[in-house]
Amino acid sequence: MLLDDKTILITGGTGSFGHCFTRYVLEHYNPKKIIIYSRDEFKQWMMANEFPRYKDKLRFFIGDVRDYERMKRAFEGVDYVIHAAALKQVPACEYNPNEAIKTNVNGAQNVIDAALNTGIKKVVALSTDKAVNPVNLYGGTKLVSDKLFIAANAYCGNKDLNFSIVRYGNVAGSRGSIIPLFYQFIEEGRSELPITDYRMTRFWISLTQGVELVIKALAEAKGGETFISRIPSFKVTDLA
């Protein structure tokens, strides 16, 4: 099967997507190894304790996508890379534009360069609907990141390597998203939930659907594709 006996590395692997992807792959496939590449040792420790049965298949690698040399070392012996690391909170990116560019743009280029200089076979980068006609810095950095990954296919030459993108909307229940925030406000006893505009709509996808779309990309990508699933939209007031 697709991921059996394969080594997969996830950048930003201790995030919501990384948790769900790791669990899904361990339950549905027999990978050789899953490498969690992230900056936070405490989150890695917590995640390791979530999967005690699979400790022989999990490897935790402290590192930052801003650090090319560290990432290149982590990529050695890896078959597939899922690039999920990003600064994604819109206000944080607006107030810290240089940091957003370092992670979301320079980090993407580091992933590309490390993949080109090791034996990686496929790279799937996670994107967002905010990269379409971006109106904020986060969306802008992800648009640039997408362009970099698509263009990287031109540099593969005779290498057995390709780059593709998975793009979806808001991930329901992911850390920092509106659903956990609404739950927090309800637990605090608030009688009203803060909604900027009652006409707002959002496109939503579950974490599992996001993982399945990434696996579809790994299976079907030839290089340069942007995979987009059809997902429903609804008003934020309906969610509230």
Regions found by a protein language model. Give the residues of each.
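Conserved Rossmann-fold NAD(P)-dependent oxidoreductase catalytic core, especially the SDR/UDP-sugar
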Residues: 80-83, 87-147, 151
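Conserved residues in the N-terminal Rossmann fold of short-chain dehydrogenase/reductase
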Residues: 38, 61-62, 102
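NAD(P)-dependent short-chain dehydrogenase/reductase
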Residues: 137-138, 143-227, 231-240
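Conserved Rossmann-fold cofactor-binding substructure of NAD(P)-dependent oxidoreductases
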Residues: 53, 59-80
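Residues in the short beta-alpha loop(s) of Rossmann-like NAD(P)-binding domains
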Residues: 40, 129, 232
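Hydrophobic/aromatic anchor residues within beta-strands of the central parallel beta-sheet
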Residues: 60, 100, 163-166
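N-terminal Rossmann NAD(P)H-binding glycine-rich loop of SDR-like oxidoreductase domains
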Residues: 6-28
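Conserved glycine-rich Rossmann-like NAD(P)H-binding loop of the short-chain dehydrogenase/reductase
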Residues: 26-43
